[in-house]
Amino acid sequence: MIYRISHTTTYDYTDSISLSHHLLRLSPRNLPHQRCLHHEVHIDPQPAIAERHVDYFGNAVTFLTIEGAHKKLVVKSESNVSLMPPAVPASAETPAWENVRESGRGRQMGHSLEGSEFVFDSPLVRTTDDFAAYAAPSFPKNRPILEAALDLTKRIHADFKFDPKATTLATPLEEVFKNRRGVCQDFAQFEIACFRSLGLPARYVSGYLETDPPPGKPRFVGADASHAWVSFYCHGIGWIDVDPTNNVLPGTRHIAVAYGRDYNDVTPIRGVILGAGEHTLKVAVDVVEMKEPAKAGAAKSVPKRPSS
């Protein structure tokens, strides 16, 4: 399957901004089952500096500097991505979760080094006894780790209610756990906290989810949104993704953009500005399946001025 993704972010400032610096993490990753065929970013006003690099976690990052007075900033990311079904083992073929935990603790780590750094606390995800206790019923002795992960994912989906008004980016996980409400970011970070509280490595995945309109209803541009899910590490197999918001194993409708310890590592756009006043933020994400194959080529990330 091939998708066209449009992600437009608009900042409107009440007062003029004289200088701003921004980091963008908007380019879909290249993975065994996912290929970014094309990517470009349109910026208005035109940046004085636009440089691209790869961060510690392997995410494509674009650094921007906007000079000159401006009261609006528009960042439009456009991508074409090809997806195949990811290879996921049968639950019974995965090792017992205790073996995964011990593989990251022993001196024989070797191949487990990739996951070991995702066992520890991070700025937005803290391990606690309460989180471990919540996860425990899904992780009885000798249960295959994928079977346990799917059960935990199912329970979070059932126990927590999707409520965009319940949390902000600053809401602590303890409050999310207490109220059992939030959005995909909260559910992903809570499940990561559960894994890590049991000594299991897990990371945050940001990306997009293709969603279908209700039967008989038109598809609205911007109806889709950026999405978040979880990836846990299993020695001998690698990373396996689960989506607690939708209670699914991510497949050909999940498009990965960035990996990190938590949301702080994968923020789509962040930056600093020189100026006073307030600002409003508008975000529109559109994910459309393409009926005709897109022309394959090297993915690029080139800042451009919008034509409209």
Q: What spans do the regions from the language model cover?
A:
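Secondary-structure boundary elements
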Residues: 96-182, 190, 261-263, 278, ...
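A generic structural signal for well-ordered coil/turn residues at beta-strand boundaries
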Residues: 5-7, 20, 37, 60, ...
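Glycine-rich, flexible loop/turn motifs
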Residues: 13, 53, 93, 158, ...
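Glycine-rich, small/acidic residue-mixed loop/short-helix segments
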Residues: 24-28, 32-34, 39-42, 246-267, ...
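Short beta-strand segments enriched in hydrophobic/aromatic residues
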Residues: 13, 81, 234, 287-289
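Linear, non-domain "peripheral" regions
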Residues: 1-133, 137, 142
